[in-house]
A protein has these predicted regions:
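Conserved kinase catalytic-core segment
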Residues: 35, 41, 93-163
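Detector for methionine-enriched segments
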Residues: 71, 117-118, 190
C-alpha cells in the first residue's frame, strides 16, 4: 500500500492509501476498527447496503509520514497495527446524508429492521452525519456509514463504550414489549430511533 493523504476529519485517526491495483482505501486506526468491521458484516448479511470494510492486524504502508494523530498504532518501517480498510469505489459518489426521522423509508419494515439492527449492535452514535446517501450507477443507496460506536455499552458520556465485548455482553437489549411494538434499550444519541418499533 502507498500513502496518499491524511484525513483530519472526525475523532478517529484516518488516512488514504492506494493498493498495487490502483484501488483507494480509507485506513482507520483506533478503538473502532474491529467493531466497525464486524458491524458492517452483520448489516450486509441482513441485506443492508454497507461500506466495504476489512480488518487487518498489520498493514505495511510505503511513504507513511508522521501523522497528526494515530502514531501509537504505527511502528518502524510504516507498519500500521489494528487497521480498518474501507474500499473507495470510483462508481460510488456521496450525495448527502439522511435522518432517522426524515427519510423515504418511514414506517417501512426495512427501516424498522435497521432500527432493530442498531439496537442489536448497541450503536450509540446514531447522528445523521453517520448516515450517507451514495449514488452508484444512477441508483441511490441509503446506509449507516459509520458504525464504529458499536459492541459496547450505550450509556451516557462517561459510561458508554465501543468494541468492548464484556460491556456488550452485560448490556440490556429489550426495554419493553407490547403486542404491537417493542422498545429497545438505548442510552446514547437519538434514543427515539430504538423506541416503538413494530
Amino acid at each position: 500500500y502507498k500513502f496518499v493523504a491524511e484525513d483530519l476529519e472526525g475523532t478517529s485517526p484516518k488516512f488514504d492509501v492506494e493498493d498495487a491495483q490502483g484501488v483507494r482505501w480509507k485506513v482507520k486506526v483506533g478503538q473502532e476498527t474491529q467493531s466497525e468491521t464486524a458491524a458492517t458484516r452483520l448489516l450486509w448479511a441482513a441485506g443492508y447496503f454497507t461500506d466495504e470494510d476489512y480488518y487487518l492486524a498489520e498493514l505495511k504502508v510505503n511513504g507513511l509520514p508522521k501523522l497528526h494523530q494515530g502514531m501509537s498504532f504505527v511502528s518502524a518501517g510504516g507498519t500500521v497495527h489494528q487497521a480498518r480498510l474501507e474500499r473507495k469505489s470510483k462508481e460510488e459518489k456521496k450525495i448527502g446524508t439522511w435522518g432517522w426521522l426524515a427519510n423515504p423509508f418511514l414506517n417501512k419494515r426495512e427501516l424498522n429492521g435497521l432500527r432493530v439492527m442498531m439496537s442489536l449492535l448497541n450503536n450509540w452514535d446514531l447522528k445523521e452525519l453517520n448516515n450517507s446517501i451514495y449514488e452508484v450507477n444512477g441508483e441511490r443507496r441509503y446506509l449507516v456509514s459509520d458504525v464504529g460506536a458499536t459492541f459496547g455499552n450505550t450509556g451516557g458520556a462517561t459510561s458508554r463504550s465501543k468494541s468492548d465485548p464484556k460491556d456488550y455482553a452485560s448490556s440490556k437489549f429489550i426495554g419493553k414489549v407490547e403486542p404491537a411494538f417493542a422498545d429497545f434499550v438505548q442510552n446514547g444519541k437519538m434514543k427515539e430511533v430504538t423506541k416503538h418499533i413494530p
